[in-house]
Every structure is written in C-alpha cells, then in structure tokens.
UniProtKB/Swiss-Prot annotation:
GO molecular function, one term: ubiquinol-cytochrome-c reductase activity
This protein's GO CC annotations: membrane; mitochondrial inner membrane; respiratory chain complex III
Designated name of the protein: Cytochrome b
Family: Belongs to the cytochrome b family.
Places the protein is found: Mitochondrion inner membrane
Membrane spanning residue stretches: 34-54, 78-99, 114-134, 179-199, 227-247, 289-309, 321-341, 348-368
Biological processes annotated in GO: mitochondrial electron transport, ubiquinol to cytochrome c
Subunit and partners: The main subunits of complex b-c1 are: cytochrome b, cytochrome c1 and the Rieske protein.
Protein function: Component of the ubiquinol-cytochrome c reductase complex (complex III or cytochrome b-c1 complex) that is part of the mitochondrial respiratory chain. The b-c1 complex mediates electron transfer from ubiquinol to cytochrome c. Contributes to the generation of a proton gradient across the mitochondrial membrane that is then used for ATP synthesis.
Organism: Anopheles gambiae
Main location: mitochondrion
Amino acid sequence: MFKPIRKTHPLISIANNALVDLPAPSNISAWWNFGSLLGLCLMLQILTGLFLAMHYAADIETAFNSVNHICRDVNNGWFLRICHANGASFFFACLFIHVGRGVYYESYLYHMTWNTGVIILFLTMATGFLGYVLPWGQMSFWGATVITNLLSAVPYLGMDLVQWIWGGFAVDNATLTRFFTFHFIFPFIILALMMIHLLFLHQTGSNNPLGLNSNVDKIPFHPYFIYKDIFGFIVFLWILVTFIWKFNYLLMDPENFIPANPLVTPVHIQPEWYFLFAYAILRSIPNKLGGVIALVLSIAILLILPFTHSSKFRGLQFYPLNQILFWNMVIVASLLTWIGARPVEDPYILTGQILTVLYFSYFIINPLLAKFWDKLLN
C-alpha cells in the first residue's frame, strides 16, 4: 500500500513522528500550550538577535552608540531591538508559567525531561544576563560588575575565577567581547537541549490535567493540537506586538539609556524583572557565599522535586491544601520580584528574608501536606 512521503522519508518522518502523527492525550488544556510558545520565543530571539548582531559592535567605545545607531539609522532597527528586548521578557514569562504548570501537575515525575528543562532554565537565565550587559549602559556595566563579583565568594578559587571571566582586573573590553560571544552561542545550545527535552518527553508521552495514564485515549497531534498551538501563537504575537508598539520601553531600566561610566554608581543596581526574585533571595542572606548558594538553589531546588514526591495521586488538582500552598508560592515569588527592585533598607530587608524563608519552605511543606491529605482520605 502507498504510504505518504512524510512517513517514509528518513528525515521528514522524524518531524512527522514529533509533530503530525504524535499520539497526544485528548484532554490537555491551554497550560500545555506554553511549550510550543517557548519554541516560538526561541526562534524569534534567534532571528532578531541575528539581525541585531549584524549591526552591533562589541567594543566598549562603540557598543552604546551601535545600539543607538540600530534604533535610529537601521531600517526598522528600533523594532528589531525592542522585539528582542521585550521578546526576552515574554520568553521568561512563558518559561515561568511552563515550570509552574510542571510543578502544579507534577510533570517532574518524568525525571529526564524535567532535568533537561531545569538545565535549559539555567542556560536561558545566563543568556538573559549576558544580553543585559551588551548595550553597555550604566545598568549593563554595574550589573555585570556586581553579578560577576559574586563568584569571588567561591572559596580559594574566587578571585582567580572573577579575573578569568573579566579578562583583566575590572569589567572592560575583554569582558564585553566574551559576553557577546557567549550570548550569541548560548541560544543554539538551548535549541539543541530543547530537542533533547522533546526527545525525552516523547519517550514517555505527555502528562495531562487528570494525571492519569492516557494511553487508552490518545489523538493525533495534527490537526487538533497544531491548530490549538497556532491559535496560541496568534494570541501571543498579538500581545507581544501590542506591547512593542504601545509600551516599548516599559520593562527597560532608565539608567541603561546612560552610557556606562565606571566612576558613577547608579543609586540602585538591579537586573531585569525576570531575575529580581532570585536577586532578592541573594540579598536576603547577609553572608556573601551564603547568598550565592541561595541564588543558585532558588532554581536548582526544582531538581529535588522528583525525589520529595510523596502523594498517591498525580497533580495538585486532587489536593486542596496543596493548591492553596501553590498559589501562596506564586504570590511569594511575585513579592520577591517586587522586593528585588526595592533599595536595601528597612522594611524591605526583613520582608525579603521572610519571603525567602517562605519560598524555600514550599518545597518542604508541599510533600508533607500531600501525605497528610492522603492519610485523611484513608
């Protein structure tokens, strides 16, 4: 019998098995749209970044002016720059929702998929930080100085590590050049990891809102979820483009429109909004090394979730007390984001410390509460 080329061609058949004939649970909701949205975001960032790199100069004398030149003189350069900057914000928003959905529906039980996902999250955060340095404004320079300086807290190797990253004794031309190099290459590494992430996901199949085995109720990915994803793309792009045209500089720091000056420190040094929760956790620990460990743990703690899982049912939809705890955690993360943008003074210091304790306590209380609920059901 004649088979279509998408099933017989050695290369096209791989894409076919991943996007067309893939068996998917029939009941996955809109929360499952964010995976494909992240793929769209990554493509958008790579494309806009590629065109920006054609006009950008990775030199401390010309970097700031080259960004200015892109926005003023290059055809639609302003659109590319703002699309890239706001695209990063939307990328992280989708990323946090995607991780949140994984925590809520306990998708972390697919160990390999979850672990690669956390590595992607780390790499994306590194890429975002490197990109923040490139315009070489005040916040770029001082943000790079403060964050890279944290590595000096590493025992014995600290200062050597910092100078190795800087390429000298201060943040200078060598630092900017290597930051641009890594900012350019990381998205392609993320793309490769994303394919591995999908490979592991397709080994097990997707989770679903009921947390049950859906092998008896699978439908082909195309046309059902292809159209669902396309609808998600349209809504996402509509919101992004509206944001670009109406609130283009809303998420950027005014300090970064001033050329970098090593002799003048900004009143309040802070990263982009999507790092503020981790930055607040870092600042809440009075000890430098302790702060760095807490900063890394704020993301790395996601890796322990598969090992602390104790519930009989899969997903928090069956655990009302855990749902309250989860949404409390979302509020805590939002408040940490707010605290990260506040100056280091009372009452913000104490508030940040309380919120940090609440943030980490979620990972301890959640499995205990699930166990308690299971006991009540017995």
